[in-house]
Swiss-Prot record:
CDD domains: UBA_EF-Ts (cd14275). Belongs to the EF-Ts family. Associates with the EF-Tu.GDP complex and induces the exchange of GDP to GTP. It remains bound to the aminoacyl-tRNA.EF-Tu.GTP complex up to the GTP hydrolysis stage on the ribosome. One of its GO terms (cellular component) is cytoplasm. The lineage of its organism: Bacteria, Pseudomonadati, Pseudomonadota, Alphaproteobacteria, Hyphomicrobiales. This is Elongation factor Ts. The keyword Lyase does not apply. It is found in: Cytoplasm.
Length: 307
C-alpha cells in the first residue's frame, strides 16, 4: 500500500524515529499508526514509552472549588486570541462555578442555569458565539468531592485566577486538618500537571495498556537470547518500572524526588495530624485528543485570488 508523507511525519513526531524506519513500520502494519508505534518499540527503534496526545484546540481550562469539592471544565474556542478575551474568560469562570453546583457531568452543566441570564449554560455559550463572533463549545467537565478533607486545585500557565492551559484537581480524604491537606494536595496537583500519570494506583491502570506493555517488553527481552526464566524476570522488572512511571502513588515526587508520592503522603500526615488518603485526581490539558484542521496558507491565498 502507498504510505503518505503526512502519516510518516505523524509517526516521526510521536516516536522520534527516523523517516525510513517510520515508513517501513507503516508498511509492515498496513498504515495503522498505533500498530506502527508498537512495531518500532519492539524493534528498539522508538524510545517513546507512550503515545503523546496531540493538543490542538484553543480555549481555556477553568477550575472552581468549595470546602469539600472542586470542578474542572474545558471550554474551547477557535483561536488563542479569543481565549485572551475578557468576555470569554468570564464565560469560562462562570461555567466552572455553575459546574460546582452540579454532579460535574457535562450534560448536566450544559443544562444548568447560567448566572444572571435566565438561560441555560448551553444558551449562554450560543449567545457568546454570536457576541464574540467565533465558534466555541463546552467540551468536558469533571468533579471530585470528599466527605472530610479537601480537594486541592492547581492551574498551570494561568492567564487569570482559576483559568489556564492545564488544570488539576487532587482529592485528599482525612479526618485531620483540611487546610494542611489542601496545601499538600496542591503540591501533588503541581506534580500531576508535570508528570501526567495514567492512574492513581496499579489496580486502576487499564488492563489493555498493561497487556500491551508486557507484550512489548517480552518481545524486547527475547531479542537478548536469554533463557525463558530470565526473560520472565526481565519483563517483571520492566513492568515494575512502567508502574513507577505511570502510577501516581508510585511516582517519584517532583518536589522531593527522594520520596514517592505514597511516602510523601505519609510525611504530610504529620502536618495533617491524621491518616490521609489520595482518593482521586483529574488532569485536564487544553485540547487533549482534539486535532485542529491544518490549512495551507499559500493555497488559501491562491483560492481567494481566484474568487
Amino acid at each position: 500500500m502507498s504510505i503518505s508523507a503526512a502519516l510518516v511525519k505523524q509517526l516521526r513526531e510521536v516516536t522520534g524515529a527516523g523517516m525510513m524506519d517510520c515508513k517501513t513500520a507503516l508498511a509492515e502494519t498496513g498504515g495503522d499508526l498505533e500498530a506502527a508505534v508498537d512495531w518500532l518499540r519492539k524493534k528498539g527503534i522508538s524510545k517513546a514509552d507512550k503515545k503523546a496526545g496531540r493538543t490542538a484546540a484553543e480555549g481555556l481550562i477553568g477550575l472552581a472549588a468549595d470546602a469539600t469539592s472542586a470542578v474542572a471544565v474545558e471550554v474551547n474556542s477557535e483561536t488563542d486570541f479569543v481565549a485572551r478575551n475578557d468576555a470569554f474568560q468570564e464565560l469560562v469562570r462562570n461555567i466552572a462555578q455553575v459546574a460546582l453546583g452540579t454532579d460535574g457531568n457535562v450534560e448536566a452543566v450544559s443544562a444548568a442555569s447560567y448566572p444572571g441570564s435566565g438561560k441555560s449554560v448551553a444558551d449562554a455559550v450560543r449567545d457568546a458565539i454570536a457576541t464574540i463572533g467565533e465558534n466555541m463549545a463546552l467540551r468536558r467537565s469533571a468533579k471530585l468531592s470528599v466527605s472530610k478533607g479537601a480537594v486541592a486545585t492547581y492551574v498551570h500557565n494561568s492567564v487569570s485566577e482559576g483559568l489556564g492551559k492545564i488544570g488539576v484537581l487532587v482529592a485528599i480524604e482525612t479526618e485531620g486538618n483540611a487546610e494542611a491537606a489542601r496545601n499538600f494536595g496542591r503540591q501533588v496537583a503541581m506534580h500531576v500537571a508535570a508528570t501526567n500519570p495514567l492512574a492513581l494506583s496499579e489496580a486502576e491502570v487499564d488492563p489493555a495498556a498493561v497487556a500491551r506493555e508486557k507484550e512489548i517488553f517480552s518481545d524486547q527481552a527475547r531479542q537478548s537470547g536469554k533463557p525463558e526464566n530470565i526473560i520472565e524476570k526481565m519483563v517483571e522488572g520492566r513492568l515494575r518500572k512502567f508502574y513507577e512511571e505511570v502510577v501516581l502513588v508510585k511516582q517519584a515526587f517532583v518536589i522531593n524526588p527522594d520520596l514517592t508520592i505514597e511516602k510523601a503522603l505519609k510525611e504530610a500526615e504529620k502536618e495533617i495530624g491524621a491518616p490521609a488518603k489520595i482518593t482521586g485526581f483529574i488532569r485536564f490539558a487544553l485540547g487533549e485528543g482534539v486535532e485542529r484542521e491544518s490549512s495551507d496558507f499559500a493555497a488559501e491565498v491562491a483560492a481567494a485570488a481566484k474568487k
